[in-house]
Amino acid sequence: MADSEKNSCSCSFCGKIHSEVRKLIAGPSVFICNECIDLCSGILQEEGRSYKKTDTLDLKPKEIKKVLDEYVIGQEHSKKVLSVAVYNHYKRLSNSGVISEVEISKSNVLLIGPTGSGKTLLARTLARVLQVPFAMADATTLTEAGYVGEDVENILLKLLQAANFNVDAAQRGIIYIDEVDKISRKSENTSITRDVSGEGVQQALLKVIEGTVSSVPPQGGRKHPHQEFIQINTDNILFIFGGAFDGLDKIIESRHRGSSMGFEANVQKVSKNKDIFCYTEPEDLVKFGLIPEFVGRIPVITSLSELNESTLCRILVEPKNSLVKQYKKLFEMDNIDLQFDDSALSEIAKKAAVRKTGARGLRAILEALLLDLMFESPGDVGINQVVISKKMVEELMVNSRLFLKH
C-alpha cells in the first residue's frame, strides 16, 4: 500500500490515520486501529471483572451474615433469614444443570418493617457482598401494561444497566422492590373492575418473579413493534420485596384473637409485642390485599423491628461506612479533625427516635447540625478541630425547621 493511500485510510472508530497509529487493520469497507482494539479489550476485561458468574457461592450463611453485620446494625433475625435465603438461592443455581426429581423453587424474600429500619440497606449490601448486579424500584410507580406509568420490564432494564448490559450477569442479579404494601387490593375479594395501581401491578409482577423470558426495550419506555428487544430470563433473578404494611398488625391480632379459643393471654402477648410482624402468616398478607398467587411466590417472610435510641446510637458510629465516619472524612479533607462527644451522639439518636424515621433520619439531623460548620470552616486556617457536644446539639436544634413540628 502506497504512503498516500495509507494516509487516506483512517480508523472507523477514532478517525486517526495510518501514520498516527502503530497498526491499522482493514475489514470490508472499515478499519480499526490498535489503540481502539486495546480500548475494546480493556472494556471487555473490566466487564468480566465487574460481575463474576455466580453459579456457585463461596460464602456460607454465617459468612454472609458476618459481612452484613459490618454495614447493618441490629435486625439479627432478618440478617440470618436473608443469609440462608440467599445461600439457598445460589446453591439452587449451582445445581440448575443437574437432572433431579426435585425442583427447588426460588427463595424470594419479603421484608416487613417501618421506614428507616434497614430494608433497602440489607438488600443493597447483599448485592455488594455477592458481587451481583442490583436494581431497585418503587412499587407505587409501576403500572400494568397498557396504562400510563412505568412498565414492570423497566425494572429489568435497570438491572441490565447495572450489569453493563451483560445479560448473563443480570439474570443472576438481585431486584429490590420497595413499598410493595402500597399495591395491595382495596379488599380481599376480587374486584370486577381493574385496579391499575393494585391487583393489576401484582399480576404483572407475578409473571416476572415466578420466571419468564421478558423482552426488554434497551432504551426504556413503552414497547413498539419496530423496536429491538433484549431477551432476559428471570428464572434465576432473586426478588426482595419491602414494605411498612401499616394496618397488618391489626389483622395479625384479629387472627390470634379468633384462633385463641378463649386463651386471652396469648392475644395480649401478641398485641403487646413490638415486633408483632414476626407472627405474620401468608393468610394475613392475603387479607391485607396481596393476591394469593403473589404471596405464594414469596416463600421467605421476615420482619424488621423499629430502631430504638440505643440501636440508632450504634448506627451512627459502628458500621463500616457509618455517618460519623463519613462526616469525619469530609472535614478531614479540609484538614479539620471532627469529634463527637458520646453525649452528643446520644442526643442525636434521641432526636431521630422522636422523629420515627429510623436510620435515614440520622443523616437529616447531622446535615442540619453541621451545615453552618461545613459552610464556615473550609478555608479558615484558624479552625483545625471541631468537637460536637450535647449542648451544641440542643442549641443548634432548638430553632431548626427540621424539628418545628415536634
Swiss-Prot record:
One GO term describing the cellular component: HslUV protease complex
Residues annotated to bind Zn(2+): 11, 14, 33, 36
InterPro entries: AAA+_ATPase (IPR003593), ATP-dep_Clp_protease_ClpX (IPR050052), ATPase_AAA_core (IPR003959), Clp_ATPase_C (IPR019489), Clp_protease_ATP-bd_su_ClpX (IPR004487), ClpX_bact (IPR046425), P-loop_NTPase (IPR027417), Znf_CppX_C4 (IPR010603)
Residue ranges of domain ClpX-type ZB in the record: 1-52
Entry keywords, A to Z: ATP-binding, Chaperone, Metal-binding, Nucleotide-binding, Zinc
Binding-site positions, ATP: 114-121
GO BP terms: cell division; proteolysis involved in protein catabolic process
Disulfide feature: none
GO molecular function term, any single one: ATP binding
PROSITE patterns: CLPX_ZB
Subunit and interaction comment: Component of the ClpX-ClpP complex. Forms a hexameric ring that, in the presence of ATP, binds to fourteen ClpP subunits assembled into a disk-like structure with a central cavity, resembling the structure of eukaryotic proteasomes.
NCBIfam families on file: clpX, PRK05342.1
Function in brief: ATP-dependent specificity component of the Clp protease. It directs the protease to specific substrates. Can perform chaperone functions in the absence of ClpP.
Family: Belongs to the ClpX chaperone family.
Name of protein: ATP-dependent Clp protease ATP-binding subunit ClpX
Organism the protein comes from: Ehrlichia canis (strain Jake)
